[in-house]
Design a protein with these regions (language model features):
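Active-site proximal loops enriched in glycine and acidic residues that flank catalytic Cys/His/Asp
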Residues: 2, 42-45, 77-79, 111-112, ...
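Pro/Thr/Ser/Gly-rich low-complexity, intrinsically disordered linker/stalk tracts
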Residues: 124-170, 216-243
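Short beta-strand segments within Ig-like beta-sandwich modules, predominantly Fibronectin type-III
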Residues: 187-194
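Substrate-binding cleft of secreted/luminal carbohydrate-active enzymes
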Residues: 26-30, 34-51, 69-140
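Active-site-adjacent beta->alpha loops and helix N-cap segments on the catalytic face
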Residues: 52-59
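Beta-strand-rich modules
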Residues: 199-218
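Solvent-exposed loop/turn segments flanking beta-strands in beta-repeat/beta-sandwich domains
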Residues: 167-182
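Aromatic-lined carbohydrate-recognition surfaces of secreted/lumenal glycan-active proteins
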Residues: 1-22, 71-80
Length: 243
């Protein structure tokens, strides 16, 4: 997670008086990223959007443009400055800028304690992360998806018990469990050690499970549907994973 400015005055419009990470810290993070030497880079973009000479969106876009190997670039956000230098809404707007610039990006928050101890910041972050999301796959490490998991469902009148296991030799890093009720899919990301779940509210229309490997690749879904359906209902919200 290098300093957010590679060299003073780069790119155009950035302050020529900024810290020279290349010359003073001996950190050529641009070379690391362009050469593919790191799996992800999280430049410390710790300035507000409105500060033109240290512009958050301009610097984020510049770092993305150096990403010749198409590895991950995540924006490191300055949560610790909320309350002292800027508001919680600043962090929310920075998250929105990250998403607007790339559909395959993300953020790293510095640091978690700032979020946990600041109710306004916690609410702002929670509003942006309303649904679970997976870390994008590192396909340069491994692009082969895992085998689809084995899934069984035992149902009673008002609940069902779901059990699953790996479908192949490769252990899962996590699981993506999707449940459909009234044509709306909801998604949970579960730890590798969890191999079962009981749904007690009502019997769903369909259940789907995917394995996620250590590089972030998703397996094909294993889908179980009650006899009254010939196939899983179409998605009308909640997630796009089933498409």
């Amino acid at each position: 997670s290098p300093f957010g400015i590679w060299r003073p005055g780069v790119p155009n419009g950035i302050s020529p008086k900024a810290l020279d990470a290349y010359g003073s810290l001996y950190a050529d993070a641009r070379l690391w990223l362009a050469s593919g030497w790191v799996d992800y880079l999280a430049p410390q973009l710790y300035w507000p959007i409105a500060q033109r000479e240290l512009s958050f969106p301009v610097l984020l876009q510049w770092w993305r443009q150096q990403n010749d190997k198409n590895h991950h670039v995540f924006a490191a956000l300055n949560d610790a400055a909320v309350g002292a230098k800027f508001s919680a809404d600043e962090i929310a707007r920075q998250i929105q800028i990250v998403r607007a610039q790339s559909s395959n990006g993300g953020e790293i928050h510095y640091h978690l304690r700032s979020v946990l101890e600041n109710s306004a910041l916690a609410a702002a972050v929670r509003a942006q992360y309303a649904r679970p999301a997976l870390v994008p796959a590192a396909t340069w490490l491994d692009s082969t998806p895992p085998e689809k998991p084995k899934l069984t469902v035992a149902g009673e009148k008002n609940s069902i018990a779901i059990r699953w296991e790996n479908g192949g030799m490769e252990p899962a890093q996590s699981w993506v469990l999707q449940v459909c009720r009234s044509n709306l899919w909801t998604t949970e990301i579960l730890p590798a050690g969890q191999t079962g779940r009981t749904l007690e509210i009502s019997r769903p229309d369909a259940v789907a499970l995917r394995a996620v490997d250590r590089s972030g690749n998703l397996s094909p879904p294993t889908v179980l549907v009650p006899k009254k359906y010939s196939s899983a209902p179409d998605i009308k919200g909640g997630t796009k994973l089933m498409k």
